[in-house]
Amino acid sequence: MGFGKGHHLHLIDGSAFIFRAYHALPPLTRKSDGLPIGAVSGFCNMLNRYLEDIDGPDAPTHVAVIFDHSGHSFRNEIYDHYKANRPPAPEDLVPQFPLTREATKAFNIACEEMEGFEADDMIATLAFRARDAGGRVTIISSDKDLMQLVGDGIEMYDAMKNKRIDREGVFEKFGVYPDRVIDVQALAGDSVDNVPGAPGIGVKTAATLINDFGDLDELLRRSDEIKQPKRRQTLIENAEQIKL
């Protein structure tokens, strides 16, 4: 991508922008043909506001907006109930998806998506490549799933809250540092993504267990050492679904 030391890449979670715009604004249609455009309008306003706010010494040298390709990804092949509880996208939002891609390109910003992969996957891949090339990365998103990427050379920025999220910010949210976020999520589950986890184990308890045992594999290997009977039982009985 022509990227290296001294460069600063911003990766925008475009799919999150679209849904935020859709739910935040009243319906709007194009007078000429009745095409829904409310989410597109909101998306463009958000993107324009972002561009106005990034001037300064810490401005990015590269920017890309990343989109989900579809509702199906390789994770559905691994776990067929993944996100199965989510309803399909609203009918009036579907025709706006391609329009947001066109709008992104009209802003002269790179627009990326890949079949079989979610925006999160592409953001992770691009972020690691950019970091490994010697540059810095800022992920523009409030998605908690992306917090596991935060570390040396990679930070997050929640544009809605005007808040930067570094390693300490991740610890404040999860009770663990970024490299153990995925372990906490595996234990506590995620109702948004329909990931089961261990029944009765919440984020705080999961963080305590991970901090006590070091990581998820060690916790499951030594689960018989847990003193609380119910907690010990749920980990032993649900070990396989926790590993999902």
Ranges and model annotations:
Residues 2-6, 50, 54-64, 109, ...:
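Non-catalytic nucleic-acid-binding/docking modules located in mid-to-C-terminal regions
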Residues 2-140, 144-166, 241-243:
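Noncatalytic, basic helical substrate-engagement surface that gates or grips nucleic-acid strands
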